[in-house]
């Protein structure tokens, strides 16, 4: 979208805060249904960020695949769980929780220090030059197809395998 600067900045801050609070809701809500709905909200915010960056095809794919299918699949799987499976040990803090917290905190601070130490001026100009050259040659849909079949072939296949395993797991839970 070609919006004026202040409106674009406001929408970025609004969607960023929506992402932040939604992701906190995914982690902190005790009820898995609320966590799944919060995940859906986060994925919608990501799709709106794609729309702000003029990637309408990626935004539509984000809405259809992740919000429309994955979130519904997660809610479907959570609906089959018994209440006692997720509410009995909420207040216990294990060693694994502590190790995970330390690892996640370390990753967070390393990302923050990397972001603060990066010279964004050079990155922005390099990105703009590459976008101009690629946009002159082919469209966005063709770029996505080329990148999925060349640069991102392995992650694309891994995601399809993960989705297949999730679907098989949902079917096995539904049969029990």
Curated annotation (Swiss-Prot):
The keyword Transport applies. It comes from Aethionema cordifolium. Its EC number is 7.1.1.-. Keywords: Chloroplast, Membrane, NAD, NADP, Plastid, Plastoquinone, Quinone, Thylakoid, Translocase, Transmembrane, Transmembrane helix, Transport. NDH shuttles electrons from NAD(P)H:plastoquinone, via FMN and iron-sulfur (Fe-S) centers, to quinones in the photosynthetic chain and possibly in a chloroplast respiratory chain. The immediate electron acceptor for the enzyme in this species is believed to be plastoquinone. Couples the redox reaction to proton translocation, and thus conserves the redox energy in a proton gradient. GO terms for cellular component: chloroplast thylakoid membrane. GO terms for molecular function: NADH dehydrogenase (ubiquinone) activity; quinone binding. The gene is ndhG. InterPro entries: NAD(P)H-Q_Oxidoreduct_6 (IPR050290), NADH_UbQ/plastoQ_OxRdtase_su6 (IPR001457), Nuo/plastoQ_OxRdtase_6_NuoJ (IPR042106). It is a multi-pass membrane protein. The chain crosses the membrane at residues 10-30, 32-52, 61-81, 95-115, 152-172. Belongs to the complex I subunit 6 family. This is NAD(P)H-quinone oxidoreductase subunit 6, chloroplastic. NDH is composed of at least 16 different subunits, 5 of which are encoded in the nucleus. It is found in: Plastid, Chloroplast thylakoid membrane.
